Amino acid sequence: MALNLQDKQAIVAEVNEAAKGALSAVVADSRGVTVEKMTELRKSAREAGVTMRVVRNTLLRRAVEGTEFECLTDTFTGPTLIAFSNEHPGAAARLFTEFAKTNKEFELKGAAFEGKVQNVEFLATLPTYEEAIARLMGTMKEAAAGKLVRTFAALRDKLQEAA
């Protein structure tokens, strides 16, 4: 279906707004994926706070112009599905990576974070805020426990020397 100029401008404006508010973006090719599977992916994306859109490449190039996702323009070939992570930088990458494991036709093209092209796997493995805090607390707890053990060992050694 042919789009008139107003429709094209609306699409560019909508994608540009999504890009400006996003933390990261992931680009994929969804050729060969069934409508049922794509519907499931869209539902999962909404739940994860990810904005997804299939956009013509020329419109997508205009939409990301001047944003930190302009570095992805080389990946805009063929049918392009773009997802913007709004809440966590790794949300879209994690969602697409999991989806690609079960759908061999789904091809990940690239990702961007903080104005640079990134590996999709790198973004997918970024810990969430809660996971990062848990890791930090675990490290701090281990350090404190280790210091306590070393203190008791030093005290034991000192008492053995005195005896």
From Swiss-Prot:
InterPro entries: Ribosomal_uL10, Ribosomal_uL10-like_sf, Ribosomal_uL10_bac, Ribosomal_uL10_bac_type, Ribosomal_uL10_CS_bac
Annotated keywords: Ribonucleoprotein, Ribosomal protein, RNA-binding, rRNA-binding
Gene3D superfamilies, per the entry: 3.30.70.1730, 6.10.250.2350
Record keyword Oxidoreductase present: no
Cystine crosslinks: none
Gene Ontology BP annotations: translation
GO molecular function annotation: large ribosomal subunit rRNA binding; structural constituent of ribosome
An annotated GO cellular component: large ribosomal subunit
Quaternary state and interactors: Part of the ribosomal stalk of the 50S ribosomal subunit. The N-terminus interacts with L11 and the large rRNA to form the base of the stalk. The C-terminus forms an elongated spine to which L12 dimers bind in a sequential fashion forming a multimeric L10(L12)X complex.
Role of this protein: Forms part of the ribosomal stalk, playing a central role in the interaction of the ribosome with GTP-bound translation factors.
Family as reported in the entry's similarity comment: Belongs to the universal ribosomal protein uL10 family.
Protein name according to UniProt: Large ribosomal subunit protein uL10
Gene name of this polypeptide: rplJ
